[in-house]
Amino acid sequence: MQRLIDCIVEFLEENGIVCSVQERCGLEVVCAMINSGESSRIVVPVEILADNLDQARAQSYMLQEAVTQISHQYGYPIIIPQDRWHRQRTMMQARLLSHMGVFSQAYARNCEVRRITKEEAQQFLADNHSYGYALSKYCYGLFLKRHTGHISRQMQQEDRSDNVGQLIAVATFSKARRWVKGDREIRSYEWVRYASLPQMRLSGGMGKLLKAFIADVKPDDVMSYADLEWSEGDVYARLGFQAETLKGSVDFEIDPATWERRPIRVTHEALSSAVELPEEKSTTKSPLSFYYTNLGGRKYRLKLTDYQ
């Protein structure tokens, strides 16, 4: 099988991106030139080869250390785990090109927010979010209403104006979690999922969807998690969220035939419902599995009412 790093280099070069394989902070990475060679982006391919959890966790620890060093020196890298590349290749390739400056532009001011059904959210997130849909109570969609300025002219020239009315982003939120602070009840909601079309750079989309949810539900606060495989969560800070705690890494079992990623706790629960297994069995290698431990996440909270 071709190495993941070679697959990425080949794909970027096929799309006109000048890149090279280099060493950064102990990792073999792809250094891609963007903005006509004026700057570069670091891509970190993550081969999934661990045949037990100890190896997977050790790899994750070393990866986290290297990513921290790379971030300080070159900016946060683009991290591409092998299972994502093989199982969700179309989405991953589109997102990778978007990071390289190859994208369609849309602005939230030219879009409208609508409530959508759970089924609509499920389909969109299955196609455009790394983890797909998760249980949510409130589902919102952002629909393209019009193009303006140079974007409109570009769409007309490329005969792409027919995507007006298209669903281009989705945000979902949980039901309320309630607790009492002093003499008042606080209602907190989780921002569960957000995704936009991977080939489109959407300016202001997250903010517009969040404002619609706040206007409808009037929460006391909204919390969410930034997936550290994608970013450090700067977009949440720009929306007024405050960083809180780190979310621990999650262990996954990977089926190399399908590259499906299954959390170890789910795998163990499914097994133990059929047969009684000793606790340590959940960490024993299956002969047909690889293991991967992700980078965890960072928790963010937006407080909309004054409480301690």
What are these regions (language model features)?
Residues 1-22:
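Acidic-basic catalytic patches of nuclease active cores, encompassing PD-(D/E)XK
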Residues 34-61, 176-177:
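Short beta-strand-loop-alpha-helix junction that forms the active-site gateway
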Residues 225-287, 293-307:
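Active-site/acyl-donor-binding loops of N-acyltransferases
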Residues 72-75, 218-222:
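Short, high-confidence coil segments that cap the C-terminus of an alpha-helix
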Residues 18-33:
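A short, well-structured beta->alpha microelement
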Residues 31-37, 143-145, 302-304:
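Active-site beta-strand termini and strand-to-loop segments that position acidic
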Residues 55-87:
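Catalytic cores of nucleic-acid endonucleases
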Residues 83, 91, 95, 100-220, ...:
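A conserved beta-strand-loop-helix scaffold within acyl/acetyltransferase catalytic domains
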